[in-house]
Amino acid sequence: MTRIGVLGARGRVGSAVVAAVEADANHELVAAIDHGDDLQALVDNKAEVVVDFTVPDAVMGNLEFCINNGIHAVVGTTGWTEERFETVRGWLQESPETGVLVAPNFAISAVLTMKFAEIAAPFFESAEVVELHHPNKVDAPSGTAVHTAEGIARARKAAGLAEQPDATTQSLDGARGADVQGVPVHAVRMTGMVAHEQVIFGTKGQTLTLKQDSYDRESFVPGIMIGVDKIGDNPGLTIGLEKFLGLDGDVNGGAKA
């Protein structure tokens, strides 16, 4: 039985994880921590794995504490940069048996969409990403959209494709979206949305649209629990859930950081 601590336990995703752990005979909830609570409860209650769905300002301190105490971490908190990843890698060098999984999205449908986008990318001249989220999301574009665009860019580069055709010379600021390695990414923030993504491909005479929708935050729970079950066998930093689903094949060159 895996002993689990949840950080951000009173948040929308965190509360769904708490409910899932409590309902599963193979996992034991030993700490449910939220803003203002003491992380020492993780050590005192012998947590083996932490699930972190907090905020960008808190996640680095949480991870430093967990790594220093040999507690594996499954992280869905947003706001990641390469500098932050490098910091985590440095901490993990001092705790080589500890594993940290950071995933831009834990919905299995979203992970598959990212994979399908990489597969499709070499066959189309043009590709753009549109992500749609609730208005309380603090980062734009989403980590999922950035991860999707980066995968598309890698696949296009590997296939030797030229830059995407775009004759735009006059536009309002932001009209063509954010440029992620040559792939335009557009962010929508709208009441009534939860987490959604569209990837649109085009070439002569045809288009392909991949569409993914998460209507409820419970959609993230199955992927989170896969991460919880497998992180102990994967020391170091892993970015993306693909590896744990067996999807880190030749197309994306592997998800191991």
Swiss-Prot record:
Residues in the signal sequence: none
Annotated localization: Cytoplasm
Any one Pfam family match given in the protein's UniProt record, by short name: DapB_C
UniProt keyword list: Amino-acid biosynthesis, Cytoplasm, Diaminopimelate biosynthesis, Lysine biosynthesis, NAD, NADP, Oxidoreductase
Keyword match Kinase: no
Family (UniProt): Belongs to the DapB family.
Regions crossing the membrane: none
GO CC terms, sorted: cytosol
Gene Ontology process terms (BP): diaminopimelate biosynthetic process; lysine biosynthetic process via diaminopimelate
PROSITE patterns per the UniProt record, alphabetical: DAPB
The protein's name: 4-hydroxy-tetrahydrodipicolinate reductase
Reactions mediated catalytically: (S)-2,3,4,5-tetrahydrodipicolinate + NAD(+) + H2O = (2S,4S)-4-hydroxy-2,3,4,5-tetrahydrodipicolinate + NADH + H(+); (S)-2,3,4,5-tetrahydrodipicolinate + NADP(+) + H2O = (2S,4S)-4-hydroxy-2,3,4,5-tetrahydrodipicolinate + NADPH + H(+)
Top class in the EC scheme: oxidoreductase
UniProt cross-references to HAMAP family, sorted A to Z: DapB
GO MF, any single term: 4-hydroxy-tetrahydrodipicolinate reductase
Function, as annotated: Catalyzes the conversion of 4-hydroxy-tetrahydrodipicolinate (HTPA) to tetrahydrodipicolinate.
Known pathway: Amino-acid biosynthesis; L-lysine biosynthesis via DAP pathway; (S)-tetrahydrodipicolinate from L-aspartate: step 4/4
PANTHER family: 4-HYDROXY-TETRAHYDRODIPICOLINATE REDUCTASE 1, CHLOROPLASTIC-RELATED (PTHR20836:SF0), DIHYDRODIPICOLINATE REDUCTASE (PTHR20836)
Classification via InterPro entries: DapB_C, DapB_N, DapB_N_CS, DHDPR_bac, NAD(P)-bd_dom_sf
NCBIfam families: dapB
Keyword Iron part of the UniProt annotation: no
Binding residues for NAD(+): G8, A9, R10, G11, R12, V13, G76, T77, T78, A103, P104, N105, F106
The EC number(s) this enzyme carries: 1.17.1.8
Residues at which (S)-2,3,4,5-tetrahydrodipicolinate binds: H134, G143, T144
